[in-house]
């Protein structure tokens, strides 16, 4: 279901984004005409946690990890899973910072999933009893593409708020 919704979301965005002719990137992978990542942050009041998921195009994530960490990776096989388990949380922690009610929030890596063309990375922040205001600094993949668009969805007490950031913009504030 999530995959269907995400594809619907991508198709709707594709209709408003300027398309450019980019058939292949430098390593021969098929390029896509827009660069998008979606970060969902849900406050779980009962568990006093923030549940964070990041969805990115697999080839974009693979390319930026290869560039930044000077390695060769293949997300389509299990042979590099331990490298991804180490590199994904390191990269994300450098590109997503959370502040809740004026206090920095640290989060832990739960794991990741590869699904055809997407990677889902999961994180959790503990001991977050309530949220009145959340600031999110999200520069995910801005070091990969200048045209990167980061969509943020934050849900607190059943109320969902969203924002779209186009690099270099990276800061978004949510009040509940």
Regions found by a protein language model. Name each.
Residues 25-176:
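N-terminal soluble domains immediately following signal/targeting peptides that reside
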């Amino acid at each position: 279901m999530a995959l269907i919704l995400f594809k619907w979301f991508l198709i709707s965005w594709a209709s408003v984004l300027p398309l450019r002719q980019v058939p292949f990137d430098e390593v021969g992978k098929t390029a896509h005409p827009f660069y998008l990542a979606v970060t969902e942050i849900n406050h779980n009041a009962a568990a006093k946690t923030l549940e964070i998921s990041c969805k990115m195009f697999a080839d974009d994530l693979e390319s930026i990890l290869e560039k930044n960490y000077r390695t060769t990776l293949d997300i389509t096989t299990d042979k590099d899973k331990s490298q991804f388990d180490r590199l994904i949380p390191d990269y994300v922690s450098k590109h997503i910072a959370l502040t809740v009610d004026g206090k920095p929030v640290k989060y832990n890596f739960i794991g990741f999933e590869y699904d055809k063309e997407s990677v889902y990375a999961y994180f959790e922040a503990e001991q977050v009893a309530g949220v009145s205001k959340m600031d999110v600094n999200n520069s995910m993949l801005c070091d990969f593409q200048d045209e990167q668009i980061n969509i943020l969805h934050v849900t607190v007490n059943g109320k969902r708020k969203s924002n779209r950031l186009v690099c270099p913009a990276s800061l978004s504030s949510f009040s509940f």
